[in-house]
Amino acid sequence: MARKKLRSAAVIHLGSENITMQLMEYTGLDDIRIITELRSRVRLGEETFQTRKISFGTMLQIVEILKGYRQVMREYGIKSYILQATTAVREAENRQYFLDQVLVKTGFQIEVVNMSREIYTKMASLLRTLETHGNMPLPREGVLLADISSGGLGLTYVKDREVKFQQNLHVGLVRLKE
């Protein structure tokens, strides 16, 4: 039997309160090993939800963090990455300027995902983990999953491995502080 090729990649999430990066090695979906994980605090959500913009100071902070993450990737010899931003960037009026600045200053291309995809990705990962590592098959009647994030609340009903219903509300933990 042929041995699967070991690959490496970085997954970076630019969220409302943190920027996280996981470096991993993998041969497939069932064989993923986290090499290291970094987390940096940013107050992006509070700012965007209050002013509808990302300030120049916050942009600089994020650029510096991402430059550091890029350096760590170089040290590990990792070139492949996925960098996704969610609610705080998605709702910023100056989103395109921010994305352009990050690309020019760090070389990172940011994918801004919509709320439905953001929640779907989290739920798919959770369900897969429960089934493969938690020995927890989905109940026959389905399952209702709640995702409470900084920027929103998502409810997803899954039955027979299909999303039957999804509702997203703009009531997250950071928004409730406003």
Regions found by a protein language model. Give the residues of each.
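Residue-level detector of flexible, active-site-proximal loop/helix-junction positions
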Residues: L44, R117-I119, H170-L173
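Hydrophobic residues at beta-strand termini and immediately following loops
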Residues: S40, V113, L169
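Active-site neighborhood for divalent-cation/phosphate handling
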Residues: I82, T86, R90-A92, Y97-I148, ...
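Glycine-rich phosphate-binding loop plus the immediately following alpha-helix
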Residues: F49, V163-E178
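Gly/Thr-rich phosphate-binding beta-strand-loop-beta motif of the actin/hexokinase/Hsp70
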Residues: A2-R33, L126, T132, M136-L169
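Conserved phosphate-binding loops in N-terminal lobes of ATP-dependent enzymes
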Residues: K5-I110
